[in-house]
Design a protein with these regions (language model features):
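Metabolite-binding pocket within alpha/beta catalytic cores that recognizes anionic/polar moieties
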Residues: 1-150
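Active-site rim beta-loop-alpha module in soluble metabolic enzymes
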Residues: 140-191, 196-198
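His/Asp/Glu-rich mid-to-C-terminal helical/loop segments that flank catalytic regions of hydrolases
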Residues: 224-271
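Glycine-rich beta-alpha junction loops
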Residues: 32, 103, 168-173, 198, ...
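Generic non-transmembrane alpha-helical segments
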Residues: 151-159, 202, 257-269
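A short alpha/beta connector and helix-capping loop motif
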Residues: 109-126, 205-221, 231
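A C-terminal functional module that forms or caps the active site or interfaces directly
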Residues: 179-226
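Hydrophobic/aromatic beta-strand patches that form the interior of the parallel beta-sheet core
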Residues: 70, 97, 121, 165, ...
Length: 271
C-alpha cells in the first residue's frame, strides 16, 4: 500500500499508544444506539477522545465474568466505520463484533428461510458499491472473517435462529430506489445497510497492517418487498409509536451473545 498522509499512529497515536486499552483484544461496534441490554453489565466510561469520530460517551469498557471488552456505539457509515477500525487496529484490538439494523429486500436468507421484520441476520459477506470500500479493496464482495461466521453459527444463543445473508452496502439512506434494490437482489443480496462492506474491507487492509477478525450481526428493521411496498418498524420506533417488534431492543440479544458467549469463546480459543 502506498504511504498516506495521515494514519492512526500519526494522529491519535501522538497522544495514545497501542497499549491504551490495557490488553483488551475484543471490541463491540454498534451501528445504532446502544440497546438497554448493556445495563446488565458494569461499564466504565472513557474520558478522552481516543477515536476521531466518536464522542467519549460512546466509548465504554464493559466487563462480564472478569473479561473486559471495548464497546463503541453510534458508529455510522463508511468513513466513520473505516476510521474507527483503523484506530482499533492501532490499539491492538484483534476481534471486532459489530451489530446494527438493516432493511430486508423481501427475499429469503441464504439458506432459504423467511427474512422478515425482526429477524436476526449474520452478514457472511457484503456487496460493495462506491463510497469508502474502494479505498481499501477492488473486490466487489467483501467477506466477514470465516472463523467468526462459523463461531456465530455454532454458538448462537438468541431466542430465534440467526440467518446468513449477503448485505448490500449503500451510501445514502434517502436515495434507495426500487431500481437500486432490484440490482441488489440481482447481486444475491438479502439485506441493505450502510456499513458492512466498509467495515470488513478496513478490517482486512489498514495502516497498522493488521488483519482484524470481524463479523456483523443485526436485526431486520424494515422490509421492502419486490412490488415496492414497505413495512417499517424503524419508522414507527422513531415516531415513538412502535407497538410491535422493536428492532433496537432485539439487538440487545446480539449484545448479550457477544459479551456472555462469543467473547469468552474467543479468549479461551474454543473452536
Amino acid at each position: 500500500m502506498a504511504p498516506f498522509h495521515l494514519t492512526p499512529q500519526t494522529l491519535v497515536g501522538r497522544r495514545f499508544g497501542p497499549d491504551t486499552f490495557d490488553g483488551i483484544r475484543i471490541a463491540l461496534m454498534g451501528f445504532c444506539p446502544p440497546p438497554a441490554a448493556f445495563g446488565r453489565y458494569p461499564r466504565d466510561r472513557t474520558r478522552d477522545q481516543h477515536f476521531i469520530h466518536l464522542a467519549p460517551e460512546s466509548v465504554r469498557i464493559v466487563t462480564h465474568g472478569g473479561l473486559p471488552v471495548l464497546s463503541l456505539s453510534h458508529v455510522y457509515g463508511g468513513p466513520v466505520a473505516s476510521a474507527t477500525v483503523e484506530e482499533l487496529a492501532w490499539y491492538g484490538i484483534e476481534h471486532v463484533l459489530a451489530y446494527g439494523l438493516a432493511g430486508g429486500l423481501g427475499v429469503g436468507a441464504a439458506t432459504g428461510e423467511t427474512l422478515g421484520m425482526g429477524a436476526f441476520y449474520l452478514v457472511q459477506d457484503a456487496l460493495a458499491r462506491d463510497g469508502t470500500t474502494p479505498h481499501y479493496s477492488e473486490a466487489s464482495v467483501i467477506p466477514a472473517d470465516p472463523g467468526l461466521v462459523e463461531q456465530v453459527r455454532v454458538a448462537w444463543t438468541g431466542p430465534d435462529p440467526i440467518l446468513p445473508v449477503r448485505a448490500a452496502t449503500n451510501d445514502a439512506i434517502y436515495r434507495e430506489s426500487d431500481a437500486m434494490l432490484d440490482r441488489f437482489r440481482a447481486g444475491g443480496c438479502h439485506v441493505v445497510n450502510l456499513d458492512s462492506a466498509h467495515l470488513y474491507a478496513a478490517s482486512l487492509v489498514n495502516s497498522a497492517g493488521r488483519r482484524l477478525r470481524t463479523v456483523q450481526c443485526g436485526v431486520v428493521s424494515d422490509v421492502v418487498e419486490r412490488d415496492g411496498s414497505l413495512l417499517s418498524a424503524l419508522a414507527e420506533m422513531l415516531a415513538k409509536g412502535a407497538t410491535g417488534v422493536n428492532p433496537l431492543d432485539k439487538t440487545g440479544e446480539i449484545v448479550r451473545f457477544y459479551i456472555e458467549t462469543l467473547s469468552r469463546r474467543l479468549i479461551d480459543k474454543i473452536p
